[in-house]
């Protein structure tokens, strides 16, 4: 019962955010040059504080997002006429909900193909799913996610990106690991989400290409 209530609440929150994005997309003061799309790790990414670019940056992340929802609502996330690059970071919630990898890949490929069709001059950066900390104290938040599952999905992402000249795979996973192969303590708030220090590492990896 409690889990269902939480799911219902999250769905309503997601719908509110998507509605807001659609409204904002109608009359932007500036056309977006760089768009960041994905789940909560994107939504909470302070791009304007940690990244520098002459291009106008827009964040269109949504907490709790799975790949099927991004596919369904893609028009709320990608907009404009002068989009230079799109940064896509998504997949950890698919793992958390035990969605089959093939289904995740089908959704991501559909998203990539839709963007390439509508934005043929836009480059897409498919960012690796980030590692988690599998320490016992984070179990409730991390749930069934494991770095083994994440690495398997990242390998599939890398292969998917190689199939399209308009897509690049960006490995951030490796930069966030500690000496035992877990998401480093300094880089996380709860074993899953990033701390400011973690976002600095993410920003460093992306700064070279923004």
Label every model-predicted segment:
Residues 43-50, 56, 69-106, 131-133:
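Oxyanion-hole/transition-state-stabilizing segment in secreted/luminal serine hydrolases
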Residues 1-36, 42, 46-53, 164:
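N-terminal secretory targeting modules
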Residues 119-123:
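A short helix->loop->beta-strand "cap" motif at the edges of active sites that frequently abuts
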């Amino acid at each position: 019962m409690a889990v269902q209530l939480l799911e219902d609440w999250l769905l309503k929150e997601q719908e509110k955010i998507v509605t807001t994005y659609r409204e904002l997309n109608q009359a932007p003061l500036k056309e977006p040059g760089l768009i960041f799309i994905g789940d909560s790790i994107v939504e909470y990414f302070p791009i304007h504080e940690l990244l520098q670019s002459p291009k106008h940056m827009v964040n269109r992340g949504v907490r709790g997002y799975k790949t099927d929802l991004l596919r369904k609502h893609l028009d709320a996330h990608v907009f404009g006429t002068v989009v230079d690059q799109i940064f896509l970071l998504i997949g950890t919630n698919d793992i958390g909900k035990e969605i089959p990898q093939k289904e995740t890949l089908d959704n991501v490929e559909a998203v990539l193909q839709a963007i390439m069709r509508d934005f043929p001059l836009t480059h897409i950066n498919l960012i690796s799913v980030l590692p988690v900390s599998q320490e016992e104290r984070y179990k409730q938040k991390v749930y069934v996610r494991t770095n083994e599952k994440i690495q398997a999905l990242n390998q599939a992402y890398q292969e998917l990106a190689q199939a399209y000249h308009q897509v690049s795979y960006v490995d951030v996973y490796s930069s966030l690991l500690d000496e035992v192969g877990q998401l480093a303590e300094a880089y996380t708030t709860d074993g899953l989400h990033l701390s400011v220090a973690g976002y600095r590492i993410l920003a460093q990896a992306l700064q070279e290409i923004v």
